[in-house]
Amino acid sequence: KLSEENDEQEDIEKVTITSDWAMDNDEVQEEETTLLFEPNIVYTPQTLEELKKMFIDQFFHFQMKWVSSTLREKSYVDPKFMRDTLLRSMLQTLPDNYLIFYFPILRVKKAPIELDIIILTPTECLCITLLEQEDQAVFIANSERFWTKKVGKNEKKLLSPLIQLNRMEKIIEQIFAQNNIELPIRKVLLTRNGYIDYPGTMYGISFVDKRKFPEWMNYLKHSVSPMKHMQIRGAQAILNTVQTTSFHRDIW
């Protein structure tokens, strides 16, 4: 029996470390409880960085369980979110005092409306529209309504992403006004793998493309301000309008 235990220990220590450990697991696994995080060391990390990587990957899965669960109810998580590199990057990089709404569906005048990304920092609300298609794509602003996407020698007309971004801003402004929330709103058009060609500047909008993304993320993650009461109130006001699809746990 002692020999079997030693063999098992050796097998565990031989497990290779891959940076995509959590990327291959597309589903949120069931546990006895989803409200308690218990890291599981399944191999022996060789460096401190490997240990950190193992911890944050497992914690990412716990975050997805936690955000989709309550004591009485649970929601299914679309596997695409487990593979979403931007979501993973935001949850693992941004400070804990940021509150993130990732493509939430809100009930506005009894109609469901899907928004893009909303980040509530202690000092402002970021409305982010994601513009990611082919690698190295160039998005050119031609008019208020239409843009052009260029990939190599190919061109394609598309609807201006600013329409969706401005729409999201108006909805959040309305929610804040109805709840007496005083929090500045800043709009961001984001592409991590392409480029944005916008002539001049536009008030209240930041254009973050492949060239500026690392600097932008670095700026966000160095926030030192503690959570603010108005920030929490703003998050609660948005949560009150969010559409939830869930089912009751068997124990209830």
Task: Please report, for each region that a protein language model flagged, where it lies by residue.
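Surface-exposed interaction regions that form or flank ligand-binding interfaces
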Residues: 1-112, 156-159, 163-252
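Phosphate-centric recognition/catalysis
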Residues: 116
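Active-site beta-strand-loop-beta-strand hairpin of nuclease catalytic cores
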Residues: 119-145
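Long, charge-dense
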Residues: 138-162
